[in-house]
């Protein structure tokens, strides 16, 4: 019984702010800038491609990650 209580206490304590570092290990004061990437791809007009996909979506999927902010 004492071992189980000790185990529960230690597991709860590990999630407390005292057990966590106050400063993240990879933190630095260096500024990071995102570079915009312009895609120069012309979409071919195929009948097999869906009409709902516009050229900017097509460009973003091919050149960079769609979640990236620099895609336009």
From Swiss-Prot:
Pfam families: Enterotoxin_ST. Toxin which activates the particulate form of guanylate cyclase and increases cyclic GMP levels within the host intestinal epithelial cells. Residues 1-19 form the signal peptide. The keyword Glycosyltransferase does not apply. Disulfide bonds join 59-64, 60-68, 63-71. Belongs to the heat-stable enterotoxin family. It comes from the Bacteria. GO terms for molecular function: toxin activity. One of its GO terms (cellular component) is extracellular space. The gene is sta2. It is found in: Secreted. Keywords: Disulfide bond, Enterotoxin, Secreted, Signal, Toxin, Virulence. It comes from Escherichia coli. Residues 20-53 form a propeptide. The keyword Phosphoprotein does not apply. This is Heat-stable enterotoxin A2. Its main location: secreted.
């Amino acid at each position: 019984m004492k071992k189980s209580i000790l185990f529960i206490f230690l597991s709860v304590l590990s999630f407390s702010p005292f057990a966590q570092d106050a400063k993240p290990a990879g933190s630095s004061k260096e500024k990071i800038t995102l570079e915009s990437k312009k895609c120069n791809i012309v979409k071919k007009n195929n009948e097999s491609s869906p009409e709902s996909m516009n050229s900017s979506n097509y460009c973003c999927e091919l050149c960079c990650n769609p979640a990236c902010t620099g895609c336009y």
